[in-house]
């Protein structure tokens, strides 16, 4: 996958992560960063622990923040404070969703809390012991925030 390739380039000396800041696309609401199903945990396991990135420069929405407006505003301010996103790595979901932004006629522009569709819950069930354990909501960057990145790379 893409994180394996980035790690390989780092090991060869082709990439240096020491000055990189990362802002993750999304995180499940109600899941702690130490939970093995969180995106925070996933990134630590698959990239951050394998390269020379400073952990204080890695940012993921706080899935445990119950105050949705506060968390979304905090994340948008964080991104703005970093000068925006230089490179946005994206994957496409089973139905074309980007982050947890489901296909729609109108998109939310900024980071927001979204209720996951039944199809997305079913698709993500494979990562959990049961369907009931799949979170029903997530924080996700909005399409406007994603599109404001200077470059976008879609991994499929």
What kind of region is each of these model predictions?
Residues 1-12:
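Glycine-rich N-terminal segment of FAD-binding domains in flavoprotein oxidoreductases
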Residues 1-2, 77-103:
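A glycine-rich beta-strand to alpha-helix segment
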Residues 6, 71, 75-79, 142, ...:
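Generic hydrophobic alpha-helical segments
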Residues 15-87:
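Ligand-binding beta-strand-loop-alpha-helix segment within the catalytic cores
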Residues 26, 62, 91-92, 102, ...:
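Short, structured patches in soluble enzyme cores that scaffold and shape functional sites
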Residues 99-143:
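Class I SAM-dependent methyltransferase SAM-binding "motif I" and its flanking Rossmann-like core
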Residues 149-156:
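Channel- or pocket-lining gating/hinge segments that regulate access to a cavity or pore
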